[in-house]
Regions:
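A short secondary-structure junction motif
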Residues: 26-30, 112, 151
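Alpha-helical transmembrane segments of integral membrane proteins
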Residues: 49-82, 98, 117-256
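Nucleotide phosphate-binding site architecture
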Residues: 32, 110, 197
Length: 256
């Protein structure tokens, strides 16, 4: 390929564009063209992004249900051996590196779970691996247990319980802030952890796309895709944080 042909190819793929120029085109929805296959980056990214959001929110929902059940159960039994052992057990289990846990569960699936539909089981295994391996369930369980324990020891809660009045309404209202805090903080970590889980399970999400674009193919890295996927993940995390910050005053009027 001659130098002139190289320049034409660079211009066609947008490799000669400056960084400010990339931002200007981004404002009109143009993220450029993939260096490897010539496909529009926006169309390529949104398909993978939807898969990652399903994985992340699915894992967050499953992790929260398990962690809330364990955490609130432990809070109503402070100091009991069983509650302490349960919290300790999930903490130890979550210390296993996420890539090692993913490989182990993948091997278990290949050996023992072949009779189940592959798509649904593989997706569920990825969700649980992401939740446990990233420490989300153990962190949520400890945080919710501590927050609920402190709430139950407050004077007004002791007075409510002494009157044999249901504490459900007071408990739910005062636990919303701790729940929002832990959910928003773990969401960012889950997004980053999807890179490992998607690679282990060959799940075509944005983490898999980013890692695949970073790997050199024919001496090329797909920089337009890398820039777009990185920006997308940062934007999602920022919007999640902003949403939680805006919800706080609505949930707790004392913050207004």
């Amino acid at each position: 390929m001659t130098d002139e042909e190289k320049q034409i190819e660079k211009k066609r793929r947008g490799l000669d564009m400056s960084y400010p120029g990339w931002w200007l085109k981004l404002f009109v929805g143009d993220m450029g063209i993939s260096v490897r296959d010539g496909e529009r980056v926006a169309a390529k990214m949104w398909h993978h992004l939807s898969n990652t959001l399903k994985l992340t929110f699915g894992s967050l929902a499953i992790s929260f249900l398990i962690a809330a059940s364990i955490g609130f159960w432990a809070a109503f039994r402070p100091g009991s051996r069983l509650s302490r052992f349960t919290i300790f057990s999930i903490s130890v289990f979550s210390c296993v590196p996420i890539f090692l846990l993913g490989l182990f569960i993948s091997l278990l699936y290949q050996r023992s779970l072949r009779s189940f539909p592959q798509g649904s089981v593989a997706c569920l295994l990825a969700l649980l691996t992401l939740g446990f391996g990233d420490g989300t369930i153990s962190e949520m369980a400890r945080h919710l247990s501590d927050s609920a324990g402190k709430l139950l020891s407050e004077d007004f809660m002791i007075a409510v319980r002494a009157r044999n009045v249901g504490i459900g309404r007071h408990f739910r209202r005062n636990m919303l802030i701790p729940v929002l805090d832990i959910v928003s903080s773990r969401f960012a970590l889950l997004i980053s952890a999807t890179v490992v889980v998607e690679y282990v399970f060959n799940y075509r999400g944005i983490g898999w796309l980013t890692l695949n674009s970073i790997q050199t193919e024919h001496g090329l890295r797909d920089y337009p895709v890398i820039m777009a996927t990185t920006l997308a993940m940062v934007t999602i995390i920022a919007l999640m944080r902003l949403g939680c910050a805006l919800i706080h005053p609505v949930v707790d009027r004392r913050l207004e």
